[in-house]
C-alpha cells in the first residue's frame, strides 16, 4: 500500500493577542508649603490731662491820711 503524504496548506496566522505586564515604582515628590507668623504688638497710649487749680487770697489795704486841724508848731 502506498501512503501519500498529507497535503500541507499555508498556515493561518491569527491576529496577535497582546498581553500586558504592569510594573510600578514609587517616587516621592516633596511639596513644601512655607508659613510665617508675625506677632504684631500694639501699644496704646492714653494721655490723661490734669488741671490742678489753686486758690489764693489777696487782702489789699488802702490808707487815707487826714489832717485834723493845723499843727500848733511849725517845724
From Swiss-Prot:
Among the record's GO biological process terms, what is one? Answer: sporulation resulting in formation of a cellular spore
Query: Which keywords annotate this record?
Result: Sporulation
Point out the gene that encodes the protein. Answer: cotD
Query: Per its UniProt entry, which superkingdom is the organism in?
Result: Bacteria
Pfam families xref list: Spore-coat_CotD
List the InterPro entries.
Answer: Spore_coat_CotD
Protein name (record)? Spore coat protein D
